């Protein structure tokens, strides 16, 4: 591990004296070799389009990245983090420039503020930091990439907590401060409970407005600002204590707005998120949370009364039924996903600095919780980078390397506070005084699956808890070592006793944690040692940081690290999209799936079969050879085997005891969930010691896409009404005419020579490029004969019928088995006997253009299928048979797909939607499940976003609604 310059002698140092500096140990780098020289670099073109209209919304060609970086990561880092105007000499064109801009700034600040024992240690620090960023081992939060090393203010914090008092001056300052934070690329939250309620009087004698009314102004301000100027939307949180007299109005704010959205949508307005008309609705730019205390929750449990208190006097001015109020919270969350819930007593029980004030608020995603007017800078580790896998099922977690990287990152994060700029003087003073950090991780869901652990299992929770305990224990250990070198945080002296108490709570929780298997046991052992060091070094040196860890959504930075999963989320699905370097994309089965199967003891042949099944079906149900007890390992956030709501809550509870702050997490519920289900989640999370959470019931928001089932139902209702109206109004003037679909000038075709009963001929079958058979030409050997003439006429009639929509299977069923001469033997191995030329022609067309199920029902099989029937008793092809012909050319429209076309004399046009194409993994899941994920479209590129903690992240371009 990293040591101080005084080495072993530091134990004899007089208390209060400082060590000379940190000795930085190499983790990954080689002396005399720069990390950039150890990788292969490649030039890439980044062209990002808006899927809605095809327009190019970002383009930069010839950027330089390591060749192992994914296309998606290159696109996101280039478009989000490269600085300078595109096309100017100031624009960054290489990842080297970006990383150098950051690590050199950190090194210089570390030297200026006396962190390192020598220039050699400073150089090792720079190289190790560069290596870790280059190899996507960790990432700072987005503001670091946006701002550090640029001429603009060096804002490094992603998370801010503001404060507002019961005065107009303070309220207007709140609006201004939020705007400045959004401008710097970050998010902010605050508690409004100090503002007097609408049930209390002003000094002038009138009634107060109440906090809900002032939320309107802040919401409107946030809606006009893009975070970071151009790359992110504003993210904000508003909180109200459960004992505030206006709590019911607060709970119902978004429910009432959702009702407005429904009415406006039904009236024809564009109410999708990002739509032109959604901005007319209030309270859409913030997450709302109710701060509940143990007194309230116990009253809910016991069915008692609960008092709402005056903001001015603290007296109870109204009593309410606690269970009814709790029910209203659950009903509102069920209806529109707000409000979330925060557990005040749990939060403050783990507070390291209670002598300096209570924890009242949180950042927008609810993972940072500390004093008012403070900030936290985040960094997240890519957990999959620490999984050692020999490819044969033997795995281990690299405990020592993980701890060393944590020490490196904590050191860098603390250095950044020294040179950072802050949006307000109060936030700057408080952050420098308490130096809150938020180290966390991403890819937990991928790690659990890769190691054969179900997300909702004792083994999965044990592994997640062990890693979290080691991370936070190592972070506080490094914080104590930093305190020995550059001193503890300014507020430590006043809060030394409660800080030590919280460290003891973390250590005690580690001591009673359950060890499950060979993966988590050595991690727990290392964590135990780390916490022992924390208690010893902290008592001697104090701590450099009031907080050390959070679990953030890791939206943009998770994609920049090519993570499969964000924060502590499980995997979205087993099949995802991978962008290709040359353009385009392909569907792939998660690489964690074969890793998990090897860990579970499956052989390579079995793994190939299971992966092939997943590729085809999107899930593991009925996968060949997969044991039923292993199904749970592959459970995901969406799909037929999705993780239950309480499975998410149990994972949060397994991690929370070793996190300084909280966890950004939304518990997803199915559309069929009840209000009682929401109540259960909120109540059990309190019992389990979770600090905060939010729920999201699929399709609860009108401003987001409905499920396919709902859309079809509504469309059917509208269509039925419309058709009835049309029939009544234009019945006498409607003419029913078929519509001909002509083939293009160039069309694919198959020419087949044949002999039937000695008569020779040729058949050319041409098809639409994407929609099956469109015409047939028949030529018999003797030109001018009656037979040849009849075949010409017959082929024209059939071709015209196909183009007017007559299904091919209708022709096949009518003309096969028709008897006339010539008949007899053929030279076609698939059709050995034909009762006529027409019989042969349509049997051949069926084999070439109809799917197996359709022609099998007509009794038409190939020679290979007949042989299979003799051997196995079944005509059906096995899973590994390549169905080239059927995949290439499907038949003309089948009978069940054929619909009457009414063409009124008045011009009536029906839009025919193009086949849906998926552009992201979220959209791919929708296509596989036949439902739509309830998530907004990205405001930058138009693709479907996906959940990341309590925020949304766009897999296509990296835009996020959160703050990481």
Swiss-Prot record:
- Read off the lineage from the record: Bacteria, Bacillati, Actinomycetota, Actinomycetes, Kitasatosporales
Q: Where is the active site?
A: 363, 365, 367
Q: What is this protein called?
A: Vitamin B12-dependent ribonucleotide reductase
Sections of the chain in a coiled coil: none
Q: Which family does it belong to?
A: Belongs to the ribonucleoside diphosphate reductase class-2 family.
Q: What does this protein do?
A: Catalyzes the reduction of ribonucleotides to deoxyribonucleotides. May function to provide a pool of deoxyribonucleotide precursors for DNA repair during oxygen limitation and/or for immediate growth after restoration of oxygen.
User: Required co-factor?
Assistant: adenosylcob(III)alamin
Key words of the record: Cobalamin, Cobalt, Disulfide bond, DNA synthesis, Nucleotide-binding, Oxidoreductase
Matching Pfam families? Ribonuc_red_2_N, Ribonuc_red_lgC, TSCPD
Q: What class of enzyme is it?
A: oxidoreductase
Q: Which GO terms describe its molecular function?
A: cobalamin binding; cobalt ion binding; nucleotide binding; ribonucleoside-diphosphate reductase activity, thioredoxin disulfide as acceptor
Residue ranges annotated as compositionally biased, kind Basic residues, are 12-21
| EC number assigned by the record | 1.17.4.1
InterPro entries, sorted: RdRp_reductase_class-2, RNR_2_N, RNR_lg_C, RNR_NrdJ/NrdZ, TSCPD_dom
Q: List the disulfide bonds.
A: 159-376
Query: Which GO terms are recorded in the biological process aspect for this UniProt protein?
Result: DNA biosynthetic process
Q: Which reaction does it catalyse?
A: a 2'-deoxyribonucleoside 5'-diphosphate + [thioredoxin]-disulfide + H2O = a ribonucleoside 5'-diphosphate + [thioredoxin]-dithiol
